[in-house]
């Protein structure tokens, strides 16, 4: 997490997900800062995160979901709020496959991605 420039950097599974940059949406920035200050890290072990998520969801009466479901939600919100499809793929760490134009020549800045992610409207 880069707090100075407000973005996440990560991904370890595939070439396209490694070192990907995802801006921190302004609506979640306070939660990110608070969690980092309290715990010193954003997320701990996946198993612990999953178990904590299950307990929290059950406590507020929401059916069980996995952490991976958050990726589906993010992707759906990108579609709903007209985030550029190529930028949605970049932020999710998806490959451009045979799309040579975007794979080789598609360069986007942090600010470009920030403009796109801020299209997602979050209720207060």
List the model feature ranges, each with a label.
Residues 23-63, 74, 86:
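Active-site/catalytic core of tyrosine-dependent DNA strand-transfer enzymes
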Residues 1-31:
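Conserved tyrosine-mediated DNA breakage-rejoining catalytic core shared by Y-recombinases
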């Amino acid at each position: 997490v880069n707090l100075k420039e407000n973005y996440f950097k990560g991904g370890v599974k595939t070439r396209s997900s490694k070192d990907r940059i995802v801006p921190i949406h302004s609506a979640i920035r306070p939660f990110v800062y608070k969690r980092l200050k309290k715990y010193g890290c954003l997320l701990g072990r996946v198993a612990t995160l999953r178990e904590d998520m299950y307990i929290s969801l059950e406590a507020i009466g929401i059916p069980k979901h996995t952490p991976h479901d958050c990726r589906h939600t993010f992707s759906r919100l990108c579609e709903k709020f007209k985030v550029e499809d190529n930028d949605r793929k970049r932020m999710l760490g998806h490959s451009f496959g045979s799309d040579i134009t975007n794979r080789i020549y598609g360069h986007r800045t942090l600010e470009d991605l920030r403009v796109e992610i801020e299209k997602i409207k979050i209720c207060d």
